[in-house]
Amino acid sequence: MLKYGGTKLSTKTANNLISVSIDLCRDYTQIAYCMGNMAEPDSVSTIAGEQKYLIPTEIGKLNNSDEWCIGDDALLREKNGEAILADDILKTILSEKSIVVSNNTYTGYEILKHFFEGLFKILKSNYHIVQPDYISVTVEYPDRILVNLIRNVLNDMGYDREHVKIIGHSESIIYYMISQKKEIWVNDVLIFDFTKHQFLVRLLTTVRAREPQPIVVEEMDMTQKFKVSDLQTEQGRLEMDTKFLELLKKLCSKHIVSAVFLTGVGFYEKWMEDSIRFLCSKRRVFQGYNLFV
């Protein structure tokens, strides 16, 4: 049995099953949920009734207390002097170093468990979802250390391992793409992921000479050339538009591209002009935060 809004529902009925997806990234985390009778998942807002879907991947410990806070709440409390933040938690976890908060030392497992508890608290308070049946977690790269930590955390929170799936962004994109209309991926597909920390280009190609036809993902890291910090000035935004246009022309000269996806906070800085005009010529272009969740 599971609880939804305080009402017990049978997990044996497909329409009552609740799946929760979590996209855990270095800069932001997102959550979505889906019930069996929903056509597609709904993104979870951190503020009820608003469209606030990005949760900063930040965690803090309240001063003189055992309580923890996450996301914007942690940032606000740290600003007000009410909490101390852990520094860049995913990067530190992957380095297998201990994490120091308020002069206390914590393991990556402990910090990640507090963060996930904060995420599920949002689900419970804003959406009345108490215990989902299935959980999928997407991460930028399915590093063994991080994957094992996530599995252990969720298992200790009461979620059976067989009901938890953890995949990387590249695999997640394939699942997402094949769920779309075939006209979108009839040719190659480009995905640009522009976050605070990286600029990744992924090219999805369907190998039509083989049966069944596999989808191959080629990944290019162009972080050194495209940085969010370069968008702080008007000149930087103009130069970014020019560089991105050059990259697009180069890629589209080598590949027949039927669709382009733009995701990440970097694409919401309103710097694309010539580049977006080029993109939208004879191609389907999609922009959004929740490509991986």
What are these regions (language model features)?
Residues I174, N187-L190, F194-L200, L204-D230, ...:
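Internal metal/ion-chelating core segments
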Residues N15, S21-Y28, E183-L200, T205-V207, ...:
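A short acidic Gly-Thr/Ser loop motif
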